Design a protein with these regions (language model features):
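Extracellular carbohydrate-recognition regions
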Residues: 2-56, 221-230
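Extracellular beta-strand elements of beta-rich domains used
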Residues: 44, 93, 210-217
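Short tryptophan-centered beta-strand motifs in secreted/extracellular beta-sheet-rich domains
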Residues: 44, 91-93, 158-176
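Short carbohydrate-recognition loop motifs
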Residues: 58-77
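Secretory/extracellular carbohydrate-interaction modules
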Residues: 71-139
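Beta-strand-rich interaction surfaces with strong enrichment in secreted/lumenal proteins
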Residues: 77-83, 149-155, 198-199
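Short, aromatic/His-centered strand-loop micro-motif at the edge of beta-sheets
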Residues: 140-162
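Flexible glycan-contacting loops in extracellular carbohydrate-active proteins
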Residues: 184-211
Length: 230
């Protein structure tokens, strides 16, 4: 059972926990340090890109170790993984805009590609400087009825950002530069034994990534409670 902390204690504990590889969510502790690394590719070339991804839409290339996505259209320009990563997973990458583009770095986990409709099917999707108003945001595809967004992260398009997106039993979380930006509970979680694709999307944007890692998450369910204050 996890005790309640005062605000200054809570902020300090979260910061220290992230430094030690622990993400504290409501009712879950996610142990990043001891999670299983399923995939890692620091720098890409044409061969490693082709081995690991399929281009579905948009323009995608490799430049100086970076995977570069360019799509001027008002729709997803996507690449999808060749391999499935089933279960409770997290994707980590280093991402950066390509000038003059300033928005929409988008990532998919626990997804699928609907070949019949030629579009993304079921999936969890998160975006940085996205969702129309410069938000860190989340949406559940394909109905997009479950969404969340916050404008509070201070995005710098010329800077490299560390982006993490994970899912634990329908508890989806997003960290940017080791700040927990979003935590969403899906009341009808996707079946992660069926949906295992990861993907990357340029939505009317131009950006690049490298340092890609995929983890099978280690976590512990926690009972939360408050200490009486009066």
């Amino acid at each position: 059972m996890r005790k309640q902390l005062k605000r200054f204690e809570r902020c300090a504990e979260k910061s220290l926990a992230l430094q030690e590889g622990m993400v504290k969510l409501a009712f879950f502790d996610v142990d990043l340090k001891n999670s299983k690394l399923l995939f890692e590719q620091e720098n890409f070339d044409e061969a490693t890109f082709a081995d690991n991804f399929v281009v579905k839409s948009g323009e995608w290339s490799v430049e100086d170790g970076w995977v570069v996505g360019k799509n001027p259209d008002m729709c997803p320009g996507m690449i999808v993984s060749q391999k499935d990563f089933f279960g409770n997973v997290m994707v980590e990458l280093t991402a950066k805009m390509v000038a003059p583009s300033t928005h929409d770095i988008n990532v998919m986990i626990n997804g699928e590609w609907d070949e019949e409709k030629d579009c993304r099917g079921y999936a969890y999707v998160a975006g940085l400087e996205a969702f129309w108003h410069g938000n860190v945001g989340f949406e559940k595809s394909p109905e997009y009825k479950l969404t969340a967004a916050t404008p509070l992260f201070r995005f710098e398009p010329e800077k490299e950002h560390n982006f993490k997106m994970g899912n634990v039993d329908g508890k989806v979380f997003v960290l940017v530069d080791d700040e927990l930006c979003l935590e969403i509970s899906d009341p009808e979680p996707l079946d992660t034994s069926l949906y295992g694709k990861i993907g990357f999307e340029a939505y009317s944007s131009w950006w690049k990534f490298k340092g890609l890692k995929v983890y099978k998450l280690k976590y512990e369910k926690i009972e939360e409670y408050y200490n009486p204050e009066f």
